[in-house]
Amino acid sequence: MVLVVDVGNTHIVLGVFEGKKLLANWRLGTNKERTSDELGMLILGLFNHEKLSIDKVKSVVVASVVPPIMYTLEHAIKKYINIQPMIIGPGTKTGINIRYQNPKEVGADRIVNAVAGFELYGGPLIIVDMGTATTFCAISEKGEYLGGVICPGIKISAEALYQKAAKLPRIDLVKPESVIGKNTISSMQSGVFFGYVGQVDYIVNRIKNEMHEENVRVIATGGISRMITEESITINEFNPTLTLEGLRLIYERNV
């Protein structure tokens, strides 16, 4: 079995593969205060809950955009799984030609998504990852990483509205029944939700225009993307495990 780990700013997502089959996946909060022992015991507990044997894990692959947690995570993996993890970074074989001014600036999560997206759907392709930040990645018909867009995620937008406007409350992220809100909370929810959907669709269309390619497919992934996909007019498909699949593929290309 292969354990893949995607470390994001808000969540750590883990998946276990047997060959190409995803046996289980879990989501933990990204807590920089956790010790390696706490993290290790959490991972052991997840395996036990699914009745999976941690001893059958032969490799661990990690992609991270949170450097401060990496020492703790690596130590937990070494101590509790007895494996030196493969960390996605410069020098890792991906099969993707990165056409960025400085390829080292591209986040590991974006590269992993590009690998999975092109393998599963082909190109041209736009991948929208709706996490703490929302990222848009453009992939050419030849599988080249062309670049993309980074903007605040929907949760950051909602939280900023609450923190910076004295009379506005904190809101739950839900799809409102109508655009026209009938009270403060529904008005805020409408602005945050429909404003975010509009942002996604507008940026996707601008990227398509600049790519100059026909039949560009748009794939969404990330925490809130299912709800956004249902409302979006540009997203073709929602894939909740895209990043995990990309980690598996990169592992296979490096063994």
Curated annotation (Swiss-Prot):
Q: What top-level class of enzyme does the UniProt entry assign?
A: transferase
Q: Which positions form S-S bridges?
A: none
Q: How does it assemble?
A: Homodimer.
Residues annotated to bind substrate: 100, 107-110, 184
Similarity comment text for this entry: Belongs to the type III pantothenate kinase family.
Please tell me the species this chain comes from: Ruminiclostridium cellulolyticum (strain ATCC 35319 / DSM 5812 / JCM 6584 / H10)
Chief localization: cytoplasm
The protein in question is named: Type III pantothenate kinase
Q: Which UniProt keywords apply?
A: ATP-binding, Coenzyme A biosynthesis, Cytoplasm, Kinase, Metal-binding, Nucleotide-binding, Potassium, Transferase
Q: What does this protein do?
A: Catalyzes the phosphorylation of pantothenate (Pan), the first step in CoA biosynthesis.
Give the GO molecular function terms.
Answer: ATP binding; metal ion binding; pantothenate kinase activity
